[in-house]
Every structure is written in structure tokens, then in C-alpha cells.
């Protein structure tokens, strides 16, 4: 019995020292050495005592038999109350039977030891009463979630009472012997332990918690008190566990006293471990109900899991002496010494491995596999690596040639940003550096030595109840199943296996388990009763009972196998790896590894990796601790000190292992608000991208998306990311995707308005400019697609059509659609972006059609043309009159008038601002309750650009008006030219000399085209003084239009005096009066009227030309001499205000005098400004020498139009008679010089022809050549002839049996009438049918337009203009020849180079005339070839028929191609939709089968459902494919009936005229 005492006392001391050592890992090496020396001393005492026990082993045979009998009796009682748990496997039974003999020997020794014990062995002893009470209240404590902790004093008293009862049964001699030997040493050790504890408290600054005592009891009355089994458990990696169970003659309760100490957070391998007594209480509080529903076989499996996690043989676990230490419960025989030593080593190794498991994944290892001293610290050795492999840590791909790192040993690749985290993870190649005694067994994991691992009590199991249920069958592999622990057959430990039965007598166990950190399960851990070992071979009665239990177990296993077969292995989550106590079989490891590679999107060579290496990778993947996976951990970390590693860990959790309960807890703890606050306010750039990634993963979960939808600040915060320079392009693209999801009203109610408001309040002038720049600047088509998806969803989600049009117009003004049309031609290979562009165009076309319908309805309802200002004003006036708002309308109009009168820029800005304000008010539907609803701050943004646009449009309008005026003048000149050509033709046809009237008529028309030359002298017949005429250089008369014509007659005499009225007044000074009719045209004279005494107001009438007066009504009027008007009264009533002008003239300084016509003088001044520093006389020299280097063609043309008239020359003559020439303006002086230049007009004409002949020929020749070539191309085109044949057959078939059928030919214009014949359903026409035939039967005809390249130019040529130009060139050359002849006859000097020029020009004109005639002949042949009338058809009309036919043909080809592409896209969409529906059905079927399989196996709310995988990705895929738009296409489309049903109210409210948007639910 002394042996027992000597082995028990050190056990308690060892447990105390191990408890201290668990916390003293933070102390200096000095404290550790003192503790180690104390443990060595205890170990020596235990070894000596074991030797004495072996000698007395044979004496104690008789008590062993009694103990065995009592055990059988107890087992029978247990079988009567409750069904025993079936024995596990036959292999275990054989192992246990072999151990029974050894266990019996050990039990005998322990019984002797207890009899001689006289004093408490440990500081915590539990007597029978406390054990009984604790056992009775165990279930109540589990329900109340409280674990009772007896006070230390009460425990000591109970232990003392228990020891006193044991003294009566044991031998006094053994008790006294043990007492005397150990008492002294115990007191010394206690003092050392107290000192160490005090020092630990001082260093750690926290009190050592009271030990947790867990006692399991049964409701049945206990048998007589046996000697207790005391187990002291500690979590220190250097402490030992000593257990001394004793078998008494009667089976007695064996309480398990377990001590657990609060741990302190410590970084080991990058992992933070922290488990306190409160954590264990929380874990064990809510498991009572879970354990109730667990079947017996599952409870058996739970016990197996606990046993596999515990040490097979508790013993000394000090790594410093594990090679020599012995187990206290070892046999006294010498034959078992070696086995005990091995057990000691195994226990030590097992403890170390369990400690390492706290940093890994709570994976248990066999105790004989690893030599603790041979385990070094072995981490990754990363080298720079170039490649595109995925990161093992975060799962993201790297860009080509970007920096990544690869482990030299295991080949794992990680990003630079994940390098710090990966350096804390042990390398998988550590398997090659681990040295164990048993190499045949597989080493399942590795962790660095000296890692702090805190152990939990043995009754705590990390496996979920549902997980345990699925793990009892051995035939079906499961991630959650734990195979039975492999213990040494020679290991004599009493707690290897037992039956956990709540109705059985008290069951105890001294097991050691390691705290696990489960990723998948955050629910409270289950509590299971640890088993005890059978200490004697079973009796025949017991064997019969065990067989019955085995049969029941087999039936239950079969039921479980059927349930597990219904569940798919693929749905097993990799996070349940932490629930596995030992390494599963190879097939399960391969399945887990393949699933992990798929989740991480990696392509590691699985065939090259061994099963052990795969298992190590799985361990590294799920290395996180349980407390690091809790939402509270991340919330506290984000609040206190956020870092890049925290965000990366959170992203991993959210991406792979998040559950509904986890997400609910995260949301309830305001985790979403914290993320947005960090994203908004933090100035750190290193983790902002990771923070945005966390938000994206949160939104991928329905619970997280709902939480984000309730945050008003979310859209604004994400919008800031777009314009911030702190984020990369990838993060901005993610922000665009998140905003796209927020726009979907179905998932984020009201999100569209929040996003739009956030974009409006940005500092940019144009709120959507970022998205347009994002599309234009980025070359990636994927990024373009994301931005365009946002734009389409934004426009689509707007219910009001006016708002949609307004938003779309903003994008159009930014140039979005122009860019989209350009890239649409080059991105046909990118179907997604092409689809988004088509959706943008479809929505735009639909809104345009709907707007047109509304406008038409509005016109019909109002009965006015809304484009007419007068009609709109009348309707508005009538509406305001009925409403009594006339005064307000008048005030608005008056204010508009004031704006225009006060502002010098005609109030452009104000009118634009008013237009914008009224437009926004008309679109506003919210009422006037809240004035803040009106947003006027952004109105001034586009005011400057709009003003510039209006100003530019005004200038463009003026220029267009000028161009129209010039075009009209040119047209009038063309008419005059044609008239002259007709006259010339008449003269040629007649062959006789024309009479004088005809010559005068021609001269008059020439004068109208060009200013006439000035006369030699002009007299004023009405001048009373009859002054001498102005003498200038003699100007010969103009050359005759034809040879042989007489010179023109002199000017007509002055008008006749007389008549009833007074004589006409003299002309004003310096003027010749009103212009008289030209000399060449005779018409009746104007009526005689008296001269007013002062200027009168002008009468704005239009003067008829003399040619038009003849043969008109005015030519047949009477003499009109009898009309005597009240001349004086008219002068008084219509007098002009000339007095004011006289006063201004007096004040005004006197400038140069201008005599000629003001308009002519202004034009001459502008022309002379081009020749700065050149005198007017020098210009005459340029004309005389025909120097083209001095004067250009345009300048010569201008100077030909600026010749002074005869009236101007006469006025200048009169002025020079009275005043000096220096007083005249420069324009007047120029007119004097040019008038004195002989033959000025003729020489200018010669110069003009020489300068512009080449350009005129170059303009006409290509047009003639284009028509000529086009005739040849059409005539020789075989494909065109084939097309005409096919159409002839098609037409006869269509018109068969009608008068239009059965024909042999048709007119060419029938080609363009093919599109007029529509199909029955109006979806196609005859040209489409023809194109389809060509595509299928004769595809070579599709390129017939390539044979007609000149057709485009020929159809644009105006043939009549070409003919006129050729004739004009010929006349001009002939006219210049006549001028040269006249100058030669008059001996007038001129430039002789003109003679050579005329010779060359005549040759060119002759060639041009021949080319024209040849082309006309070819065209006549072509018309005859196609059965067209020669005289009626012009070339431009003929070729235009073919051009229009080509356009129709190409349009039909494009339309058919688009229809084909649309059909293919629609088929692809339907196929994708069908595939998604099939996947949804499969998911639903799988979930239903899983739910209907068994109520115990139904999917809990804590499991990760398939529907919650990634909702954001699914929504974006629907948007990209276009399904989101097409499915809801009819949701908001307002019909024509709705628009017409809205009647116009009296106040013309636009909200009542136009359909209102439906309210969103």
C-alpha cells in the first residue's frame, strides 16, 4: 500500500508543477530550471517505489480475485438499468483482453498502496459524499450551464474523510511507510510550488484561477466506498500526468478531478491561442441537450474521440527526461519495465504533439510516432519566383512577371503581401526532418516545439453532435469520424476503453485532450463522459450481453450507412477538418485535397505528392484557432488596431467558411458598420483594398447584403473609392460591381436613389464623367463591361421614363454612345461587352419610341402643334385663364423681357438657367412639403458650356444665311447665263444680223452680270449751271458680243419735261439721281413726280428689272399724268428726322469724303486692305502684266466685281471740279485710277481666264470621266445581269395570274420597289427574300457592288451642270480671243503671253468637248441597252437607281446577319438559363433529400447553404448576360393605353399629362 502512496503523491505534485509550468513559460530560464529539478527529484522517488512494488506483486493475488468478482456484480447491475453501449471492434477486444492480465497485477499493487495510506496524497481529494452529490446534480448543472467548483477547503475535508475510510480497509504498515517517506518531501515541494505560483502571478499580472472539478455521477446509489482514482491534469507542455486508478473488491465510483488553468495569449506560428475557464464553461454549458439526442453508438464514438485525443498512458511528460521516466501505473514485474519506459516516452511525445495541435488543427497523433527531441523548428524558406501561380494563402492569381515567392522545400507559392503570414506556418517538408521510433506509422502533423498549448478537460469535445452522429460507421469515410486510438498492447492503462452509459455506475476517466479550434463549427461543444477500462476478462454472462449489444450496434450502423449514402460527399465542408481527431484514410485525404485545390483554384501536381504531404497541406490550410474564427475576435481587432493581416484573415473566413450564425453574429456586433467606417475614415493605404474586399465578401452573403442595404452611408462610402487615388484599378472595378448590385431595387430597396444621390454630390462638374473615362481609358474589355453594366442597370432601374431619358442624355453628352459605336465594330469576339452595348441601344430606342408616342398623344389631346410657339402660347394662356393664373404667367413673361433688355448678351445664360429650372420642376413629383428635395446646386455646372453652345449655334445660323444668299445669287447668274446661251443659239440658227433691239437686250444682260465700264464724260442735263464734264482717259466701248455687230448707241437723252405735274427735282449733289433704265432694254418711263423739299421716310418696296416690266401689267398702264397727290401733306407726315443728323454732323470731326456708292466703297476698302503698302496704281500694273505671283485667282475675281459704275464716275468727275482729290477716300481714289485705265474690264477678264482655266478644267474632267467609266462598268457587269434575271423570275412568280405577271422585261426603277412588297406578318420584304436566296444558292452575287466602283461618283454628278460648265469655258475662251483681236486693232498694249495661252486653252477645250460628246453617246447606248428613254433620263437619275438598289441590298444583308446573331445569342441565353435552372433544381433536390433523410441529419441554420454561396456573383452574371434586363423588361414599360388614359388637367400639370412611375414596394 505504500507503493500507492508513493506513486500518488508525486502525481498530485506533478500535476501542480505542470499547472505552474503551463504559465511559467513566460518566465526566465532560471525559474524553469528550478521547476525541472523538482520534477526530477519526484521522478527518482517514483522509480524507486516502483521497484519495491514489483517485489510485493505476488503477495496480492487474492484481492485481485475479489476485485474481479465485484466488477462483474457491478456490471450486472448496470445492464439491468440501462442498455450497455456495444463494444467497439473485435480488434480492440483482443487488445483489451491481453491487457487485462497486466492491469490486474497493477490493480493489486495499487490496492495495497491504498490500504497503507494514512494522509491525503494531493491537495484536492474528493470523498464519497461529495462525489455522490456531484454525480446526482451533474445533469442539473449541465442544464443550468454551470459547472460547480467546490471550494478548496471543502475538497480537502472530503478528501480527508475519504482517506479515513480507506485507512480501515488498507494495511497500516504500508500507510505509515509511505507517509514517513513522502511527507517530508511533499512539504518541500509544496513550498517551492507556492513560490513559483507567486512569481508567475507577479509576471503575468493575473490570478491563477481555481481548478475546475468535474465529477460525473449516476443516479443509482453507489456501492461501498472504494479507494478513489485521482487524476491531476495540467496543460503545461513540460509537466507530467500521473494517474493511479485502483480496483477494489467492489466496483466503486472513480471520480475524475480535472484541473484547467486559464491560458494567456501567445503567438506561436502566427496563431494566437487563448482559452480560459470561462471559455470552457461556455463551451460545456449548452451541450446537455445535444448529448441527450445522441444515440448510444454515437456516444461510443465520442468517447473514442476523447480517448484518441488523450494520452494512452498518462505519465511523465517532461521532454527533458522522457527517455528515462516511468509510468506510475506500470506493472511491478520486471518484464514490463521496458514497456513502461516506452509508454513514458509515448506519453511525453503525445503530450507534445497535442500541444502542437493547438496551433494546428487539433489533430491527434499516435504517441509512438514522434521523438520530441528530434522535432526542430522548420518553417518555409521562400525565394523570389516569377510566374502566374495562385497564392496558397489568399487564393488569388498573380499577374505575369509580378513578384511572388516560392518555398524551396515544399514548393508552395504565395504573394508578397501574404509572405509575412506564410512565414508563420510550418513547412510541409518537416515530415522529412521528424525522427520517430516507429517509422512505419504515418506522422500526421508537425508544429514547432515549445509552443504554448492549453488543454481542455476530457469531457469537452469539439465535434458537433451532428458530426458525431455521422462518424460511427467505419465503412463510410467521413471527415468527422475519429478512428479508435492506437495504443500499445503492453501499455497497462486502466482508462483505454469504457462504455459511456448515463445509468451505469459512476464512470471516470483520466484523459488528456487538447483544445481545438474548429473553423466550421462555432456552436458550443458537446459533453461526453470519458470511459474507463475494463480491468478483467469478461464473464460468459458479460460476453452474452456484449453480443447482444454488438447486434444492436450493427443494426444502427446499417441505418447510419443508408443515411450517409444519401448525403453527397462533395457537400462535406473542409472546415470540419478540425473536428477530426486523427488522420483519416487515404481515400478521404485525397478527396479532401482535391476539394481544397478546387476551392483555391490551384493546379498542384497531386500525383507527385504523397498522402502525408497532402495531409500536411490540409493542416496548414486550417491552422486557425477557434477563438480567432469568432466574430468577436475580428470585431475587437478591427476596433483596437486594424491591420492588413486581420483583413486578409477575415477575407479568407468570409470566402470559405462563413455560416449563417457566424454572419448573424458579425452583423449584430456592428461588424458591417465598422468596415464602412474604416473604409471611409482611415488614412492607411496598405489595407484599404483588403477592407473593400471584406465588404464585397460580406455583400456576397444574403444576410450581409441585407445589412449593407440598411446603411445609408454605404453608397456614399463606396462612391468615394471611385475617385480616390489610394485604390488600385482592381478595387475600383470591385466598387463599380458593388454599386451595380446596390442599384437592384429587388435586393437593395431604395439603393438606386442613394447611389444616384451619392454620385450627384461629388465634386466633379459632371457626375457620370468617371464611368465614361473608365470605359475609354482602360484597354481591358472586362473593365469596360463592368462600367457599362453599371450604366445599363442605372438607366434600367429608373421607373420614370423622363428620368431615364435625362440620365441617358448626360451620358450621351459625355460622348459615351459615340465611343460605343466605334468599338462595337471591333469587339465582336467579346460577346459580353457586345451584349451590353446592344442593351444600351435597345433601351434607348424603346424610350425614344415611347417618347414619340407620348408626344403624339399630347398633340392629339391638346389639339395643337407643340413645336409651334404661337400655338403653345395660346394653349398655355387658355389653361392659365381657367386656373386664374394669368397674372403669374404675365409676371413670368415680363421678367423674361426685362432679362433680355438689361443683359447685353441677350440673356443667354439666364434663359438657359430658366429652361433648366422649369424642366427640373416639371419632372419633380415629390411635392413641396420638403424644399430640400429640390437640388439646384448642380444647375450652374453646365451653364457656361450651354451658353457657348447657344452662341455658336447663333453664329452658325448667320453663316448659313449668308451661304443661302450667295447660293441665290449664283443661281440668278446661272439663269442669266442660260438666257444668254439661248439668245446666242437663236443668233446662230438664224444666220442673219440681229437688229438693234436684240443687241441692246444682250448688252443689258451683260451689264447686269458685270459692272459696265465708265463713260468718257457725263453731263448732268438737269444741272442749271451746265458745268463742263469730267474729262478722264478715253474708254472704248465694250467689244461686241458677236462679230459684225454695230457699236452700241449713245446713252438715251434726258427725260422729257412737262406734264401736268411740276418738273422733276434735280439730283442730289454729287449724285446722278436715281438710276435710269439700262440703255440696252426699252421700257416705259417712270411717272413724273415732284421733288420733296426735304428727305422723307423710305417705302420698302421691291424694284422690277426692266426686262420683267415689258409684257407685264406695268407696261400696259396709262400715262398717269392726271394723278395729283397732296404732296405737301405727305412731306409733313412722312418727313425724316434730318435735324438730328445735322447736329451730329457738326459735332463730328470731318473725315475723307466718299462719293461713290457706300456699299461699293466698303467692299473696295476691304479688298485694298489685302495689299498693305501697295498703291492703287500699282494694282493696275499687276493687271497689265498679268503677274499671278502678285495677285491670286480669288483676288482677280474680286477686282473684276469692284469696277465703278458710270454713275460713280460721273459723281467723281463732279466732285473733282469743286474739290481736291486728296479729300476723297482711298476707295474713291481707286475708282478714279481704275476708271482712267484703258480697257480695264477687258484686261481683267483676260487675266481672270488665265488664272482660273486650269482649275475649271480640273473640276469638270473627273465628273465626265466618272460617268463614262460608270457606263462601261454597268454595261460589262455580269453579276448585275444575273441579278436582273433572278428578279425577273421572282417578279413573275409573285405576280403570277395577275395582269402584272407573265412579262419579259421591266423598268430599272422596279429594282428599288422590292422593299415595298412586305411579307404577310410585315417582318420581312422581297429584298430580304432575294438576299437570302443569294446567300444560300449564289453567294458570289453578294459582292456585285464591287464591280461598280465608279457608280457612287457618277450618281452624284449633275450632268446638266457639267454640260453648262463646258459651254461656259468655251465661251470664255472665245470671248478672250475677241478681246485680243480688239486690242490689236486699237493698238492697245497688252501682255503677249496671252496669245500662247489662248492656243493651249483652245486645244484643251476641244478635247473636253470631244470627251463630253463621247460620254453622251455611251450613255445613250446604255439607256437603249436597259430599255430606257434616251431624252428623259439623265445620267445621275439612271445611276441613282443602281445606287439605291445597292444600299437596299447591303441593308438587307446586314439585317439578316444581325437576325442570325440574335438567334444564336437567344439560343445561348436559353441554354445558359436552362443550365442554371437545372443546377437550381439539383441543389433543391439535394437539400430536400438531405432534409428528408432523417430529422437528426437535417441541415441546421448554422450550415452553409448552397443558395448563399455568392449572391453578388450570381446577380452580376445575370446582368452581364442580359437576363436581368429581359426578365424584367415588361415590369416598367408603360403602354400606349396608359398614356392616352391620362387626361389633361386645367393647370397643364406634366405629371398628369405624362404617365407616372409605379410605386416601388
From Swiss-Prot:
GO terms for molecular function: actin filament binding; profilin binding; small GTPase binding; zinc ion binding. Residues 103-120, 305-320, 1484-1498, 1536-1561 have a biased composition (Polar residues). One of its GO terms (biological process) is sorocarp development. PROSITE patterns: FH2, GBD_FH3, ZF_DAG_PE_2. Residues 32-85, 158-208, 541-573, 952-989, 1398-1491 form a coiled coil. Residues 1086-1475 form the FH2 domain. It holds the Pfam family Drf_FH3. Residues 1019-1081 form the FH1 domain. A zinc finger (Phorbol-ester/DAG-type) spans 379-427. Residues 1488-1518 form the DAD domain. CDD domains: C1 (cd00029). Keywords: Actin-binding, Coiled coil, Metal-binding, Zinc, Zinc-finger. Residues 220-229, 1034-1070 have a biased composition (Pro residues). GO terms for cellular component: actin cytoskeleton; cell cortex; cell trailing edge; filopodium tip. Residues 1-63, 77-187, 211-279, 305-365, 465-549, 1009-1092, 1466-1508, 1526-1561 are annotated as: Disordered. Belongs to the formin homology family. Diaphanous subfamily. The DAD domain regulates activation via by an autoinhibitory interaction with the GBD/FH3 domain. This autoinhibition is released upon competitive binding of an activated GTPase. The release of DAD allows the FH2 domain to then nucleate and elongate nonbranched actin filaments. Formins play an important role in the nucleation of actin and the formation of linear actin filaments. This is Formin-E. The lineage of its organism: Eukaryota, Amoebozoa, Evosea, Eumycetozoa, Dictyostelia. The gene is forE.
